[in-house]
Swiss-Prot record:
NCBIfam families: rplV_bact
Summary of the function given for this chain in its UniProt record: This protein binds specifically to 23S rRNA; its binding is stimulated by other ribosomal proteins, e.g. L4, L17, and L20. It is important during the early stages of 50S assembly. It makes multiple contacts with different domains of the 23S rRNA in the assembled 50S subunit and ribosome. The globular domain of the protein is located near the polypeptide exit tunnel on the outside of the subunit, while an extended beta-hairpin is found that lines the wall of the exit tunnel in the center of the 70S ribosome.
A GO term for molecular function: structural constituent of ribosome
Residue ranges of the TM segments: none
Gene3D superfamilies recorded: Ribosomal protein L22/L17
Family per record: Belongs to the universal ribosomal protein uL22 family.
GO cellular component: cytosolic large ribosomal subunit
Database matches in InterPro entries: Ribosomal_uL22 (IPR001063), Ribosomal_uL22_bac/chlpt-type (IPR005727), Ribosomal_uL22_bac/org-type (IPR047867), Ribosomal_uL22_CS (IPR018260), Ribosomal_uL22_sf (IPR036394)
GO biological process: translation
Official protein name in the record: Large ribosomal subunit protein uL22
Length: 128
């Protein structure tokens, strides 16, 4: 059973209907999951992927939620969970030769990032 003092506060932010496939967003989220807020921002700044811009926006929104709503310090925040789910697909057609048409699928995704305060190392050392 979890005691009330052991429960951690989480701040969550969602980005919905983001243009780009969920699989391409997941490859970036897998690299920043579990990192501190500062380390994640540095990693996102230097990654060569297009999906880093909306991920950065959602991450900053989650940190702003933690700071404003829960009173947490941004320097002590860690990304506890990050996920990307499929959104609706916009279907378009590309005209081709001899009256044919090829379909184009413009994919969207929903990004969810939650942050929580990092566990204090002094408390864990005292328990050992």
């Amino acid at each position: 059973m979890i005691k009330k003092s052991e429960m951690t506060k989480k701040a969550i932010a969602h980005g919905k209907y983001i243009r780009g496939s969920a699989s391409k967003v997941r490859r970036v989220l897998d690299q920043i999951r579990g990192k501190s807020y500062r380390d994640a921002l540095i990693m996102l700044e230097f990654m060569p992927y297009r999906s880093t811009d909306p991920i950065t926006k959602v991450l900053r929104s989650a940190v702003a939620n933690a700071e404003h709503n829960l009173g947490m310090e941004p320097s002590s925040l860690v990304i506890s969970s990050a996920s990307a789910d499929n959104g609706p697909v916009m279907k378009r057609f590309r005209p081709r030769a001899q009256g044919r048409a090829f379909s184009i699928k413009k994919q969207t995704c929903h990004i969810s990032i939650s942050v929580e305060s990092a566990p204090n190392q002094t408390n864990t050392e005292a328990q050992n």
